[in-house]
Amino acid sequence: MNDNNIQVLPEMSSVWQETLNWQPTVEQKQQFQKLYELIILGNKKLNLTRITKPEEFWEKHLWDSLRGIKFILENKIHWSEEKKVIDIGTGAGFPGLLVAIILPQYAVTLLDSTRKKISFIENILTDLNIKNALTITNRVEQIGRLFKYRETYDIGLLRAVASTVVCAEYALPLLKIGGIAILYRGNITTDEQANLPEVVKLLGGKIERIEEFKTPLSNSIRNCIYLRKVGKTPINYPRSVGVPNQKPLLSLKKI
């Protein structure tokens, strides 16, 4: 792991505290650094991320991943709860790996359809000694129809996966009633805001809140959309592999 080209992540203790009302432990900071090193090295073989500079990596991967669960971080009561989490389309492991690192009581499932990326993440789990995470190589449309996974999870995480309505169709079938899906977004379009409530209702959910915020270093606008599962998702959702993305529910409404 000694690579002279790999730099050290910035400390940022005060920024963690000011923005998330939370700070990582010394051990967690060490895990963040090792995760950074593993991803930079893995990037030489796999197309994991274009974000490689330490400050950018801290802001756009570490901080951004944890901003979505700020409501958990700032209330220690949640830390000891045993929750089941699924990171849908985990890619290089964000935000799911971060959740597994800082919330060891949570059982985190990292889902991706690309076997090479899942193999890489499995090596990370071993190298970082993360015991509370497992991986699945599959399409979300397929596992969303399986009894083993459907209505199983307390929290669904979706970051840089698809449009909001597609993410809703991916996530809500997997959530227990009372569960929450967290959609990590940049800007939200007017069309998304107009169409999402009806689509979410169809899938057994409701929009609990939308949080707009700026990132602490680059002042980029970001949004997190929180969808609460309030009723059963109709059995015909999610639709077959590829269909949610090719024919989003919002477009079907207009036909």
Curated annotation (Swiss-Prot):
Amino acids binding S-adenosyl-L-methionine: G89, F94, D112, S113, T114, V140, E141, R159
Query: Could you name the domain of life of the organism this protein comes from?
Result: Bacteria
Give the matching Pfam families: GidB
**By its UniProt entry, which InterPro entries does this protein fall under?**
rRNA_ssu_MeTfrase_G, SAM-dependent_MTases_sf
Q: Which family does it belong to?
A: Belongs to the methyltransferase superfamily. RNA methyltransferase RsmG family.
Provide the function of this protein.
Specifically methylates the N7 position of a guanine in 16S rRNA.
Q: What is this protein called?
A: Ribosomal RNA small subunit methyltransferase G
Q: What is the lineage of its organism?
A: Bacteria, Bacillati, Cyanobacteriota, Cyanophyceae, Oscillatoriophycideae
